[in-house]
Amino acid sequence: MSSSRVLVTGASGYVGGRLVPALLESGVRVRCLVRTPAKLAAAPWVDQVDVVQGSVGDDLTTAMSGVDVAVYLVHSIGAGSDWVEQELRDAQNFAEAAQAAGVGRIVYLGGLGAGDETLSRHLQSRQNVGAALASTNVATVEIRAGVIIGSGSASFEMLRYLAEVLPVMVTPKWVSTKCQPIAIANIVSILVAAITTDAAISGVYEAGGPEVITYANMMETYAECAGLRRRILIPVPFLTPRLSSHWIGLVTPVPVPLAKELVNSLVNEVIVTGRDASSAFGVTPTPLHTAISRALDVTQRGAIPTTFFDADLVHFRATELDPAWAGGTVFSDQRRLTSALPPDEIFAELATIGGEKGWYAGELLWKVRGFLDQLIGGPGMRRGRKAELNVGDALDFWRIEAVERPTTLRLRAEMRLPGDAWLTWQLTPRDGGTLITQTAEYRPRGLLGRLYWAVVWPFHGFIFPVMLKRIVRAATPRS
């Protein structure tokens, strides 16, 4: 099916935003059905797809025309009081439109969970949607998954913020419920295989990772991967899903309605008990520790301009289409200044920073910070610098990560920190001169990391604007 046309709904969502580029890479033609096409404007692949404006509840004649496989990734969780009924109506409309258009296959990503009366409203709705999509004579493949691991996934972001912010947690009973988390890269691979296979397939497949664990185990694994101290979990049996969803809304940026449905779903065991999707579609499940480590790795890479991404890692990072709170917490201090000088003359001055030259502002504060770093085993300011700036070289207590003359200098902190920090300068030609953008970025690790930023932030207000002004002032025109 490499030359087939595939309709993807939910392309601006978490899974859809990762599935579309994978499908394009496999050689299929992609059409995206979106209510608001402007939401796809930031996607790097938008020019390679056919975009149709509309909703799954609308007339889908145009969207379905000439389509071989229709992918259903829409989920209206918490969208109004009648969202369960609306989901069912939309799915039925989609299935009937697919049948009328002669679509060969529907592929749907649903939710794991034993189909009985104990299922949460969220999971029951997911499975009812699957049944509605399969109600016509169009072959329907339903991939059921539980917790998906990757930056941008609501489940993963909830896990991330809970583990990062709270070293001690009072926990409800649902943290002891069994689940089978799966890496986003595995989900994308399974979906691509289900969409592109030439085999006649249909029915329900269940997707899970190699480990069956509890949510508490996941938090412990996250803490280990993130270099945090072991989380202390104190069981409190009377903490209901309703109360815990409001608590999650308080300590994480995940919206309360979404947190409520996610928590309600965690009351149910979400493990593979039926036909295994990974085996059926030839996908090797990624271990949880590896999946979390990759998600954390690309979270850090996301702050670093780079041209390299492992073909697997790319699925784990937060994308332009994800919510603003996806990808973890990043604190930043950004300053801009313009100069009549061209970029090469500004960069020539910038390239002298550090070592004996110093840091242009707050020299005593830099030295005190270096001294404190040495006291706790860090490199301090004693390493100095080489005459030329080269990627990988030390620069006081920084490491040079990127040098692109005359536009970019990026430094990564190697001082002892409860997090990761970068200092970047971008030089952009502007009206015959230069726009200089100086950005300090900090990704905190745990509660201590957040407290650290609160302590040093007032000093940034003094040091960074003066530093930028003095760099620009010190630059001299070339004769």
Language model regions located:
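Beta-strand/loop substructures that line and gate deep hydrophobic ligand-binding cavities in soluble
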Residues: 413-461
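Glycine-rich portal/gate segments that line the openings of hydrophobic small-molecule binding cavities
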Residues: 330-331, 338-347, 351-418, 470
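Conserved glycine-rich Rossmann-like NAD(P)H-binding loop of the short-chain dehydrogenase/reductase
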Residues: 28-35
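SDR active-site strand-loop-helix element
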Residues: 9, 33, 73, 106-111, ...
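Mid/C-terminal beta-alpha module of Rossmann-like enzyme folds, strongest
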Residues: 194-261, 269-335
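NAD(P)H-binding glycine-rich loop region in Rossmannoid oxidoreductase-like domains
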Residues: 38-101, 111-118
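Oxidoreductase cofactor-interface core, primarily capturing Rossmann-like NAD(P)-dependent enzymes
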Residues: 11, 19, 26, 116-228, ...
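N-terminal Rossmann NAD(P)H-binding glycine-rich loop of SDR-like oxidoreductase domains
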Residues: 2-28
